[in-house]
Amino acid sequence: MSMLRAIGGELQCLFPMNPHGQERFEWFVLTLKAILVPITVSRTSNLRRAIATLFGVSIAEWRYDTFMASVKLPWEAVWETLWRAIPQPLVEGRLLLALDDSINPKTGRHIFACQTTFDHAAKANQTRWPWAQTLVTLGLLMPIHGRWCCLPMAFRFYLRRATLQAGCLRVRGKAVVFADKFAQAVSMIVSLARCFQTARVLVITDSWFGNNGLFRPLRQPLGTRVDLLSRLRVNAVLYAQPEAVPGKLGRPRKYGARLGSVAECAKQQRAKARCYQVRVYGATREVEAADQVVMLKTLRCAVRVVWVYRRSQWVALMTTDLRLSVAQIVEYYSARWKIEAGFRELKQEIGSAATQTRHPDAVTNHLHFCMVATTLTWIYAAHLKQAPARRYASQSTTEYAFADVRRALAKDIAEEGFGSDCPKSGKAQRKSFISEVMRLVA
């Protein structure tokens, strides 16, 4: 049984077995297939037309819009099914989770979760305060056929307190309660960690999330099996580990002598730097780095700090997992960049940014569909015996891309789909039609 048929059978069990439930399942799978086939942008209207054109299923416009805004889609169970379907999700015994936030600019009012948001990455010709949705996203980092990939696992819409105070925002009749990004991140990580109860969890973040606002709430439900890997700010102060003084009365010291700021220690550690062979950004490179175990007051525990030196710059990384080697720390943090590539795959290639929906449930369901499609694509890649060939290879880029996996998946969808989701009549005709359209698009 193929991967698509196996997952399709598990997803079918999540829907009621009555006629309405099975019709909802059929439309659910058809929507996923329409997103996965790289032919059109994933607007709701485009998806309905793609379903009619490619798969021969005509759905009334009002019925399909009602389905896309349905409150009966079992997303929690769908995500848990996908989490368990990932082959070999652990990397050296750890679950590597990338955490970051992104913005999704929109045009038009009365769009759910839109607010005036500060964009720190805005270019010179872009506004610093766009009208956009803010997404806190959790992804799974894992190597697939020799390259790091980021599989979207969960997301939350972040709404500022000022936005909620300006107007009462309701979803399904209930007022939206403010939750900061740390609380949203903790809820997603805890849910995912409970699905993998025996695995150690390493959360890889940028410097904004790398503090006790995230680490302390995570340690309460998950204990010592969760650790943090982040980048250090240059002005963070480091302390030596405390030394026990025999015979001294009173409470033992929590911190040793002050070592200085990260920038000051970087100059001192430069003479102790060594060269390591690390796989970074798709190639094995020689990295000059130095490390030291110190105390950090922002986390109130011992951390391993790694200074990575370049020609004229340096970067300081820290982790609470003292068992990680220098090479592992550098490689895992460099793999964090794949979540940024995942945002591009989700917004531009899958087309989540092009949605025109405004209703809260429709906006949320559409993003769920796009993220599930992205994760399914990478799960499909992990089940392939060998990596697909890169379509537009060059001397500097030889690894396969997300679009290459999606193209191979579209061919399998044309062959068999998810099993019981295709009507029996006209199957061969639709199969050849999809293949012809794929050839024209390519």
Place the predicted regions along the sequence by residue.
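Gly/serine-rich nucleotide phosphate-binding loop at the start of the catalytic core
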Residues: M1-V71, W75
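Single, function-defining residue in the core of a domain
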Residues: S2-P16, K106, H110-I111, C150, ...
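Structural motif
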Residues: N18-V29, N125-W131, T357-L367
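Short, amphipathic alpha-helical segments that act as regulatory/interfacial helices
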Residues: V29-L36, L135, F369, A373-Y380
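Short secondary-structure transition/capping motifs
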Residues: L36-I39, F67-W75, K123, T127, ...
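Active-site-proximal, Lys/Arg-enriched surface segment
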Residues: T66-R161, A290
